[in-house]
Amino acid sequence: ELRDREIIGAQRVLWGSDYPHSEGSLGFTTEALRAAFGGKPEAQARAMIETNAAAFFGFDLDALRPVADLVGPSPDEVAQPLDPAEYPTASTCNAFDTEQVMRSW
């Protein structure tokens, strides 16, 4: 969906970690966010990572900001593209699948 965000609209995309599935980003979420959103326009990335979900689920972002600042990656960190050579080899997360092949375990 990220690849097609200009067609379907970034306001219609929500990022998810797929936890607890094996293709999820657990342990490598910052890297997965960087792989997906690094180098993308900040307004689009923020919408797909944060504000779309907050609006859909009714989250109070002002109330959550102190927690996010404590445990989450910063917008500046997410904005840094992750070179495929840096993709974690220990992860089975689809974000690091350069072939975009669906896996079956």
Q: Can you say where each PLM-predicted feature lies in the sequence?
A:
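Active-site flanking residues adjacent to catalytic metal/cofactor-binding acidic residues
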Residues: 17
